[in-house]
């Protein structure tokens, strides 16, 4: 029997360094505090909706939030987002972040996503002990990357499953955090529905600091929009829409990969 379309909600738990990109100085303690506040709001929505999510966490965040890592509900998946969000050494950070997360959580960590969806060599990811990665956004983001020729569907390559972030079937409109934040909900919902119907899965990703109050920072409107609580309500509405319409099954990325391996 074929599985229902998979709805994969993911969040990149990291230091809130977005103000640094726009010239605002923010120390590590404040970065972590903003991420904690936003993550609390996100997880509250997820908990109330009783759906699982996949948490890609940096080693730095984990080191400073050990109790949260230990207490994380087992229905959620813990995966790696590298050790630091601001810089990356594939020869050390891939392995060290996985080992740290496993030590703190007592769980096996099999998934990886690179900060800012940047490319990492599959050989390095595989050597560090991962089963899958989700660092590909198969679209064009000016100034970031151009993956217009990349697969929009999951694929197995060089010993790893690659689970792309979702884009629409037509025109490859990215259904990433900026789209959720800036598109009217009715349009974003329709894009998600079309993508689930055509691709059979939906891989959405968010950041905890999006759900915190960012009004004190000099960020562009398209980055800070919804940070005073509106985005929390929007996420609630989106999940409720998926549930009421019966559009698919909420699942962790690890379990989705298991389905792929089993050919379902």
Language model features with spans:
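Active-site beta->alpha N-cap acidic-glycine motif
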Residues: 2-74
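Conserved, mostly hydrophobic/aromatic
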Residues: 12, 46, 55, 81, ...
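The substrate-binding groove and active-site-proximal loops of carbohydrate-active enzymes
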Residues: 26-33, 58, 82-89, 109-110, ...
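Generic structural signal for well-ordered alpha-helices
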Residues: 39-43, 66-70, 94-98, 122, ...
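C-terminal domain-boundary segment and adjacent tail
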Residues: 44-50, 185-264
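Metal-dependent polysaccharide deacetylase catalytic core of the NodB/CE4 family, i.e.
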Residues: 49-121, 135-136, 167-169
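Active-site-adjacent pocket scaffolds in enzyme catalytic domains
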Residues: 103, 107-205
